[in-house]
Amino acid sequence: GNSDVPVGQYTQKILAYYQLDEATLAAAGVITYGSNVKEVTTQITEGSVDAGVVYCTDAYSASLTPVDEATREMCGQVIYPAAVLKAAPNAEAAKEFLAYLQTDKAMTVFEGVGFSAV
């Protein structure tokens, strides 16, 4: 992904971890960029790229089998934050939803699609 999207930022960290020069790889046509993780997932699914960096959950959703996983050492912890907005028109419902996200039932759903608790 592009550097302005999270998956692109994680990819840059992975390349740096392996001491690979992104600019050199891009100039050589070895790497290409997607505007978001769904675009990269589609490129992999269609076979228009040899490999791509996507979230395991996106790979799972697209029936792709990851060949490797990035570690926290490579790119840090991937976190999906959630919050109730100050101006939320349905703040009480949003609070209830956030409370649900912290239940064992929700965790079972998350784990079923490849997420883990932080």
PLM regions and their residue ranges:
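Exported/periplasmic ABC-transporter solute-binding proteins
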Residues: 1-118
